[in-house]
Curated annotation (Swiss-Prot):
InterPro entries: Ribosomal_uS14, Ribosomal_uS14_bac/plastid. Belongs to the universal ribosomal protein uS14 family. One of its GO terms (biological process) is translation. This is Small ribosomal subunit protein uS14. One of its GO terms (cellular component) is small ribosomal subunit. Binds 16S rRNA, required for the assembly of 30S particles and may also be responsible for determining the conformation of the 16S rRNA at the A site. Part of the 30S ribosomal subunit. Contacts proteins S3 and S10. It comes from Paraburkholderia xenovorans (strain LB400). Pfam families: Ribosomal_S14. One of its GO terms (molecular function) is rRNA binding. The gene is rpsN. NCBIfam families: PRK08881.1.
């Protein structure tokens, strides 16, 4: 199980990303708009740099909902591979069967 602080850090990153998403999108639109002047581009870039680092959605890491494991997490289930295996063998995920060929 991952440390609780790491799980809470990821939750904080998700909250910050959601909070600053409109502002970040607005600034990126100004930066990408070629009809704006160089001064406006520069001002928007400086303002974007002033936003918190953790408000950037690329810093968010997907973690297992049960264990908090950061690697081997399936997006579809939100669980790590080993927890998917345990739960699937108990038959708790509908429609999921063991592969055989």
């Amino acid at each position: 199980m991952a440390k609780l602080a790491l799980i809470e850090r990821e939750k904080k990153r998700a909250r910050l990303a959601a909070k600053y998403a409109p502002k970040r999108a607005e600034l990126k639109a100004i930066i990408g708009d070629m009809s704006k002047s160089d001064e406006e581009h520069y001002a928007a870039r400086l303002e974007l740099q002033q936003l918190p680092r953790n408000s950037n959605p690329t810093r968010k890491r997907n973690r297992c909902a049960i264990t908090g494991r950061p690697r081997g997490t399936f997006r579809k289930f939100g669980l790590a591979r080993n927890k998917i295996r345990e739960i699937a063998f108990r038959g708790e995920i509908p429609g999921l069967t063991k592969a055989s060929w």
